[in-house]
């Protein structure tokens, strides 16, 4: 994000430090095969959406492009495929809550106890998008994706700080941290999951990829800058 909230440097600092996200990881199960995806819900998403509807896709695209704007470090979020990564995560096992205990009892917990809601991640995302758009319509008479950048920033900072209250009691901060987490994971996950297109996230931080053995490079690059073309799972398959 830009200006008043989290700039790119602070955004990445929080990422590499582990962040403050108290939800489950979105990557861990097999990625959804491309041929199983539905007809694209929006023209800007080439591979098509499996979970997000038109309104939700517009929201997610606006969020990832605001959090990850195009600059000298990387392309914008949609060009990195972060919206596709999020859609696949929501459509897959993580979004369905496959690895979550979903039988209650449901009580308000502490942040160090992890995710405590009776909603599957996909349900949280869907409800959070609808609630955020409802707030934006009430406050600005527009949906989130229609807002200028400064107002998008106000909304995201409000969600992050828990200063926006959703009707029905859905915790805005939990929605934000879940959304923030999936943006981070989309930036730095293996491209096979839909995000980090062209390994742009890895190139930005100098990550070499999935190479498991570096012993042969210890002497070769001693006291030298280690510059290498990053390798993904697909490169080694």
Protein language model features and the residues they cover:
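Conserved catalytic-core segments centered on acid/base and nucleophilic motifs
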Residues: 10-14, 144-147
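Structural recognition of short helix-loop-helix hairpins that underlie histone-fold modules
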Residues: 68-69
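C-terminal segment of N-terminal export signals and the immediately downstream linker at the start
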Residues: 3-10, 25-65
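Sec-dependent signal peptide hydrophobic core
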Residues: 15-20
């Amino acid at each position: 994000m830009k200006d008043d909230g989290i700039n790119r440097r602070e955004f990445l600092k929080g990422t590499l430090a582990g962040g403050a996200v108290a939800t489950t990881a979105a990557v861990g199960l097999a990625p959804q095969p491309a041929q199983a995806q539905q007809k694209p819900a929006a023209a800007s998403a080439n591979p098509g959406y499996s979970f997000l509807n038109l309104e939700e896709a517009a929201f997610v695209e606006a969020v990832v492009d605001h959090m990850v704007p195009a600059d000298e470090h990387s392309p914008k979020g949609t060009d990195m495929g972060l919206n596709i990564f999020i859609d696949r995560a929501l459509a897959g096992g993580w979004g369905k809550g496959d690895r979550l205990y979903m039988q209650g009892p449901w009580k308000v917990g502490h942040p160090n106890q992890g995710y405590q809601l009776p909603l599957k991640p996909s349900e949280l995302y869907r409800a959070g998008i609808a609630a955020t758009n409802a707030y934006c319509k009430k406050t600005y008479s527009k949906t989130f994706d229609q807002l200028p950048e400064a107002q998008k920033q106000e909304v995201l900072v409000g969600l992050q700080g828990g200063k926006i209250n959703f009707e029905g009691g859905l915790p805005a901060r939990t929605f934000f941290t879940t959304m923030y987490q999936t943006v981070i994971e989309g930036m730095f996950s293996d491209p096979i999951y839909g995000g980090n297109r062209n390994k742009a996230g890895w190139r930005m931080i100098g990550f070499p990829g999935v190479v498991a053995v570096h012993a042969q490079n210890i002497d070769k690059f001693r006291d030298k800058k280690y510059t290498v073309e990053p390798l993904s799972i697909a490169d080694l398959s």
